[in-house]
Amino acid sequence: MFDFGLGELVFVGIIALIVLGPERLPEAARTAGRLIGRLQRFVGSVKQEFDTQIELEELRKAKQEFEAAAAQVRDSLKETGTDMQNSLHDISDGLKPWEKLPEQRTPADFGVDENGNPFPDAANTLSDGISDVMPSERSDTSAEILGDSGQTGSTAEPAETDQDRAWREYLTASAAAPVVQTVEVSYIDTAVETPVPHTTSLRKQAISRKRGLRPKHRAKPKLRVRKS
């Protein structure tokens, strides 16, 4: 800390020995050592304080630089966002107007309401169209329907007779078949008696084994007698 050489220290020691004497010199040396130690600790704390202040200043500078960079990035993003919005507005302005779209139709244009039910006017027009059919056409269509039904009735008769014949053969075959007697067999569940394990004998065997494992000869404790 102090730029003292060996000669200066020896000189100071000689002066202290002359001034203080050999009796008070050790105590003065201890006091001087304590003072020097306190001074060194104080200087070390001050140095540490300066170092922390310097580090904090560097951190503040780094924080300011980081905030400045973040602000620049934010401004650039805002500029790009505004440019994109302007370009989108330009594109939307250049599009065709909505009036040129095809006209949208509603259910009323097709003669039905929102639930899909036809209006009364549409039902009346439909019934009028059906009533305008010629009576001759009605008679022709009814005759055709009757002719078709007669043909189907004439062709259905042999099918019914074949079915009756098949049923008759089935019934006669089932009547002539021999009767088979069934024998009922019943099974009776019988409980099987299981032998009871010899628990008492196993317990006795375990006790005898434990007794066999015990030491046969035990050392007798020796009593110590205190001598008075």
Curated annotation (Swiss-Prot):
Record keywords: Cell inner membrane, Cell membrane, Membrane, Protein transport, Translocation, Transmembrane, Transmembrane helix, Transport
Electron transport recorded as keyword: no
GO CC, one annotated term: TAT protein transport complex
Cited Pfam families: TatA_B_E (PF02416)
Transmembrane intervals: 1-21
Start-end of Basic residues biased regions: 206-228
A GO MF term: protein transmembrane transporter activity
Region (Disordered): 126-162, 196-228
Taxonomy, superkingdom: Bacteria
Membrane-topology annotation of the record: Single-pass membrane protein
Subcellular location: Cell inner membrane
UniProt xrefs under Gene3D superfamilies: 1.20.5.3310
One GO process term, biological-process aspect: protein transport by the Tat complex
InterPro entries: TatA/B/E (IPR003369), TatB (IPR018448)
Subunit note: The Tat system comprises two distinct complexes: a TatABC complex, containing multiple copies of TatA, TatB and TatC subunits, and a separate TatA complex, containing only TatA subunits. Substrates initially bind to the TatABC complex, which probably triggers association of the separate TatA complex to form the active translocon.
Record function comment: Part of the twin-arginine translocation (Tat) system that transports large folded proteins containing a characteristic twin-arginine motif in their signal peptide across membranes. Together with TatC, TatB is part of a receptor directly interacting with Tat signal peptides. TatB may form an oligomeric binding site that transiently accommodates folded Tat precursor proteins before their translocation.
Similarity comment text for this entry: Belongs to the TatB family.
Protein name, entry field: Sec-independent protein translocase protein TatB
